[in-house]
Amino acid sequence: MYENTNSEENNNNIQSQNMDIQKFKKYIRTEKKADERPKVIVMGRSNVGKSTFVKLVTGKNVRVGKKPGVTLKITEYDMGTYILVDLPGFGFMEGIEKKAQEKIKDEIIHYVEDNKDAIAASIHILDAKSFIDIVERWGNKGEVPIDLEMADFLEELELNPIFVVNKMDKIKNSEWDNHLDKVSETLGFLPPWRQWLDNFVPAIMRDNYGIDGIKHRINKRINIFKKSKK
């Protein structure tokens, strides 16, 4: 009796292909779901405490250094409900040529532009004391420091940055409000700074001061972001 073995083989091949297609579709769905998670970017001039912040938030053993330029690549951390993105430090970096510094700046800009629709929150960390000093020094030369360039860049993309004013232990307690007023005004926010609590967080990273406030603002931004996508 003649058996149609070719037909059976074809059926097996079709079933195998269907299984492969289902696996591929499942893979695509998984990847799509991961890609759809909101991103929280962290940026700042080298040596402002960015790596310390990432270490505190992630619990990971992030390398923390005293010299500028510890973080030289874009690193993503899986936080479950969102992805934390540690961007390289910008500005002066000891031992790094100016050409390389410009390349890092370009990489940051390209990453943010390419992912702006997925960014739920942007954290811009500043050194409380040196930020004002740098702005004044560059201003005297008629130039705009990279700190303000990046702040304006985030505003242009409507990413509504959260400015973490770190190393507030360098400022006398009695002068905190006046100093933060100056920082906020320099960044284009009309004083007093306390009317912009969603945008400014005074912090002392090494003492874990301000971390809870930052996390609260991140979660708030993520919730708003998710609602906007529904």
Curated annotation (Swiss-Prot):
GO molecular-function term, one example from the UniProt record: metal ion binding
Cofactor(s) the protein needs: Mg(2+)
GO biological process: cell division
Pfam families linked: MMR_HSR1
Binding site for Mg(2+): 51, 71
Domain called EngB-type G: residue spans: 36-224
Superkingdom, natural source: Archaea
UniProt keyword annotations, A-Z: Cell cycle, Cell division, GTP-binding, Magnesium, Metal-binding, Nucleotide-binding, Septation
Residues annotated as binding GTP: 44-51, 69-73, 86-89, 166-169, 201-203
InterPro entries assigned: G_ENGB_dom, GTP-bd, GTP-bd_ribosome_bio_YsxC, P-loop_NTPase
PANTHER family assigned to the protein according to its UniProt record, in alphabetical order: ENGB-TYPE G DOMAIN-CONTAINING PROTEIN, MSS1/TRME-RELATED GTP-BINDING PROTEIN
Function of the molecule: Necessary for normal cell division and for the maintenance of normal septation.
NCBIfam families listed in its UniProt record: PRK04213.1 (NF003255)
Family to which this protein belongs: Belongs to the TRAFAC class TrmE-Era-EngA-EngB-Septin-like GTPase superfamily. EngB GTPase family.
Protein name, entry field: Probable GTP-binding protein EngB
